[in-house]
């Protein structure tokens, strides 16, 4: 029984997901439905958390928009996601960057990972 479920989940996994780590800056293009129209909306932010659970994998992006912190959780293999692009690689030493929520300005910056 579990082999059938595992096989169905493997068929639904996306193959074009780039590798990224916490601290990286990503641009995620998402399909948004407004009435009868369908359009792409971009969300660019820093990865503050990754949850690896096969088909149920997710990652959290954080950006500051007009002085307000905005966080959004994306399901990695969701059909709503059109593309994921790595804009910048960040050098951090923790897996979860929740401490960025309390920081602002220069202390919220992340160094760039060199040689990656």
UniProtKB/Swiss-Prot annotation:
Coiled coil: none annotated. Pfam families: Ribosomal_L19. GO terms for cellular component: cytosolic large ribosomal subunit. Keywords: Ribonucleoprotein, Ribosomal protein. The keyword Ribonucleoprotein applies. It comes from the Bacteria. GO terms for biological process: translation. One of its GO terms (molecular function) is structural constituent of ribosome. Belongs to the bacterial ribosomal protein bL19 family. This protein is located at the 30S-50S ribosomal subunit interface and may play a role in the structure and function of the aminoacyl-tRNA binding site. This is Large ribosomal subunit protein bL19.
